[in-house]
Amino acid sequence: MSVTIAGIAGSLRAGSHTRALLRAAAYDLPPGIRLAIWDGLAHVPPYSEDLEAGPAPAGVAALRALIAGAGAVLIVTPEYNGSIPGQLKNALDWASRPRGGAVLEGKPAAAISASPSPRGGARALADLRKVLTVTGAGLTETELAIPQVHTQLTPGGHIADPALRGRITALISDLAQHATAASPALAA
């Protein structure tokens, strides 16, 4: 099995915990799984149906190409005012278009929320799951809300808690299995 998973961090902040968490997860991947982390969120313009008639803006084209070329998508979101960040929602709006031919339709997807709060961004996780479901993504049942994320990463960029590391690895393995089931060519 060889599966590429598109990793999308929902924060624009350079020192983002969600981006750091994605990078840390890449250190502990099971064999045959690759995490392609996308850093182009800031380059996606506001969604406008008027722009669909012409070529996609460069940031949108890059996002769509990443998702189309991956077997699955893993999104890690912070919680901003009880929901997902606006820029992440905007990117998902672009990836959900055009209806009937969007790169998210049927794509296996998993969601993680991470927050310094004790709830781990659970409200953002619920909203992200709702958005992914509406887009037609093949959302897995496995999900994680990671509380006190600022204490979960080592200065070297690894996941400090072995139990959390195991849960993230299990989520990624489950997502890869969904990708393989959705596209048997990945199992070769």
Regions found by a protein language model. Give the residues of each.
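Short beta-strand elements in bilobed, periplasmic/extracellular small-molecule ligand-binding domains
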Residues: 33-46, 139-147
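N-terminal beta1-alpha1 ligand-phosphate binding loop
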Residues: 2-33
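A general structural signal for well-ordered alpha-helical segments in protein cores
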Residues: 5, 18-22, 44, 60, ...
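Glycine-rich phosphate/pyrophosphate-binding loop and the adjoining helix
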Residues: 138-188
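Helix-loop-strand module that forms the ligand-binding subsite of alpha/beta enzymes
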Residues: 55-135
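N-terminal beta-loop-helix "entrance" segment that forms/cooperates
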Residues: 40-57, 152-156
